Amino acid sequence: METITTKFDNFGKLSISENRRYLMEGDKPFFWLGDTAWLMLLKLDEDEIYTYLRNRKGKGYNVIQTVLIQSPQDVESSLAPGRKDVTKSEYWNFVDQILDMAEQMGLYIGLLPAWGSLVKSNILNMETMRIYANFLGKRYQNRKNLIWILGGDVRGDVGYDVFCLEGEILKSYNPERIIAYHPFGRTSSSLWFHNEPWLDMNLFQSGHRRYDQASLGEWDDNAERETFFGEDNWKYVDRDLSYDIVKPTLDAEPSYEGIPQG
């Protein structure tokens, strides 16, 4: 496997602009062009990930959004079909190798510690999250190409205290590391965490099940709770930037081209 090394003077130096509205890489604006490969670490081998990352790098992507633990079954069983065993050190050594690979290509990894279902199911609670977040904070505090993304397709009020604990612990290990929160479809992280010091920027998810987001079925527990913007995802940006405390905001998951209703 060929090694690709891409060097940028400001790579790994992500920060928030002086006016608090944008991401910066060194002294230049940073445009987050992300791709979601949520199960990349759990399902692909090193060669497959190399092929994927090289493809995305060639297309101009600069952030890959992926998750470390995606479902309760990943934790409860070491025999989850088609998945790596997250309870073994071999998995975490593999993650280290992939982070190295991405860094060599000049790619940031938007790393989601655990999908929101683990908080909803109480597998990650105040006690277990404290252990897990400290483990991650110690292991990855010096990674230059890492962006923390908390949440995972979940409303913040499902486990507000747990998510805040996670953010506070991770921020304590590296205060300069960007931390965001991936919310439930058709919501923004600003609805719950905007004033939290650990949250550096907001993410919203305009949704991808159906572009107008008008009728998503029984699973959509957000139908009547928040403002409905339909196709106008720019309105999330407008709302987030209207708050007294200003933070950058980004559509972390808009419509996908391969979904029939997207």
Language-model regions, residue ranges each:
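Active-site mouth of glycoside hydrolases
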Residues: 4-213, 222
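Catalytic-core region of carbohydrate-active enzymes that cleave or remodel glycosidic bonds
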Residues: 175, 196-262
